[in-house]
């Protein structure tokens, strides 16, 4: 495969959906739509305790700031945000990029409806339902792909990686953050025994080495 795509920015931290798996993921995010933002942004004491206990106090607000910092404030190309989720972290940044063309995709209509409430009034942003494993986009048509807190939900991650690579222009950037298996036994237990069974996470999950190997086969430069 070609290696022209320039760089991948990784901060530690759909895809051929069919049958029961698709329903499971859809239902999981429908039931969590009212608490999703609260958990990620740690708006209340319960979400703060959950993050501290199971995610080693990871601050998603800080991670989001670091991820979005890789997108220049004067960015004017084509940008793909997948999955967009509720756009709780990206609303301000995407709204400010008036000269860009931004496509926000999510498989979950419940997540997408909330994103549309935040972003729908901006002419340079479109929010559409879609499958990252089968992106309805031309080859080499996107300058930057951002994937924030979403890869863990993709059951066919191999297709997701390939589709993102396919739509990126040579020299384009893939900016993402991932759940990485093997960093915390407590987190791994939570993911395996609760989050995956409920449909919020979908195996397989990569270790840092496995993820690095995947990316280095696709991209000329990886920054982990």
Q: Can you describe what each PLM-predicted range is?
A:
Residues 133-144:
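A short acidic, Gly/Pro-enriched loop at the edge of an enzyme's catalytic core
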Residues 8-73, 88-92, 111-114:
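Conserved class I S-adenosyl-L-methionine
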Residues 78-134:
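Class I SAM-dependent methyltransferase SAM/SAH-binding core
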Residues 1-5:
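Cys/His-rich short segments
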Residues 158-170:
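A short glycine-rich, Lys/Arg-flanked "PGG" loop and its adjoining helix->strand segment in the class I
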Residues 72-73, 139, 161:
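A short, aliphatic-rich alpha-helical micro-motif
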Residues 144-156:
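A short SAM/SAH-binding and catalytic strip from SAM-dependent methyltransferases
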Residues 175-224:
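C-terminal alpha-helical "lid/dimerization" subdomain adjacent to the S-adenosyl-L-methionine
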């Amino acid at each position: 495969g070609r290696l022209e795509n320039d760089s991948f920015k990784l901060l530690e931290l759909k895809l051929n959906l069919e049958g029961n798996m698709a329903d499971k993921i859809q239902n999981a995010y429908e039931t969590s739509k009212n608490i999703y933002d609260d958990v990620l942004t740690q708006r209340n004491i319960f979400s703060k305790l959950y993050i501290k206990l199971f995610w080693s106090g990871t601050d998603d607000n800080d991670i989001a700031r670091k991820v979005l910092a890789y997108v220049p404030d004067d960015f004017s190309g084509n940008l793909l945000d997948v999955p967009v989720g509720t756009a709780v972290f990206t609303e301000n940044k995407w709204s400010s990029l008036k000269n860009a063309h931004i496509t926000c995709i999510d498989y979950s209509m419940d997540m997408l409806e909330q994103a549309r409430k935040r972003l729908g009034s901006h002419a340079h942003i479109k929010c559409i339902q879609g499958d990252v494993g089968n992106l309805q986009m031309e080859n080499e048509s996107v300058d930057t792909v951002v994937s924030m807190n979403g890869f863990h939900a993709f059951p066919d991650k191999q297709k997701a990686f390939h589709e993102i690579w396919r739509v990126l222009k040579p020299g384009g950037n893939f900016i993402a953050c991932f759940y990485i298996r093997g960093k915390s036994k407590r987190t791994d237990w939570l993911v395996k025994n609760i989050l995956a069974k409920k449909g919020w996470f979908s195996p397989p999950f990569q270790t840092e080495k496995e993820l690095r190997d995947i990316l280095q086969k696709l991209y000329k430069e990886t920054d982990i």
